[in-house]
């Protein structure tokens, strides 16, 4: 029984029967549009209706047979609008743009990368041979020598100071 119902649904989808009749489309009468909206003007070569049923600003809608000015080859190329409601349950409902739900901020936490720790820290050789460094030290040696000069003026005992810098390398 289930297979028979499934096959009936498939045949209904293949026939592509619509909820509405393709030959009857709602149109707004042209004289109403000309009186209401004079910007349209007189158009003797009306190829498409200026306002369809979905126009929310026009209060009246009437059933009328569509007037096709195009050739039958072009009429076959016309496509069925995407917002047409289907009567069969096997056909998908019309798709609409749905907003994605925003996740809570607790889901937005980003864990730190494990590879990032390895790349940020440079590899340092911890085993380093210690080399003795020599630091030069300067010592000042002061020699005080009292020289007595015999002169005819006055004898002044002034000690002379000389500074000698000695550098030695200590480890």
UniProtKB/Swiss-Prot annotation:
The keyword Metal-binding does not apply. It comes from the Eukaryota. GO terms for biological process: lactation; protein stabilization. Mammary gland specific. Secreted in milk. The record marks 107-108 as: Cleavage. Residues 1-2 form the signal peptide. The modification Phosphothreonine is found at residue 147. Kappa-casein stabilizes micelle formation, preventing casein precipitation in milk. Belongs to the kappa-casein family. This is Kappa-casein.
């Amino acid at each position: 029984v289930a297979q028979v119902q499934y096959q009936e649904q498939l045949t209904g989808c293949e026939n592509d029967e619509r909820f509405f009749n393709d030959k009857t489309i709602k149109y707004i009468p042209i004289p109403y549009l000309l009186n209401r909206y004079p910007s349209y003007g007189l158009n003797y070569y009306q190829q498409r209706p200026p306002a369809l049923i979905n126009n929310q600003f026009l209060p009246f809608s009437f059933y009328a047979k569509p007037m096709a000015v195009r050739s039958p080859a072009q009429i076959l190329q016309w496509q069925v609008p995407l917002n047409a409601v289907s009567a069969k349950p096997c056909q998908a409902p019309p798709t609409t743009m749905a907003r994605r739900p925003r996740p809570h901020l607790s889901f937005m936490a980003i864990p730190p990368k494990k590879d990032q720790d390895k790349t940020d820290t440079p590899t340092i050789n911890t085993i380093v041979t210690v080399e003795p460094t020599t630091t030069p030290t300067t010592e000042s040696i002061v020699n005080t020598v009292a020289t007595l000069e015999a002169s005819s003026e006055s004898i002044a005992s002034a000690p002379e100071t000389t500074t000698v810098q000695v550098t030695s390398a200590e480890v």
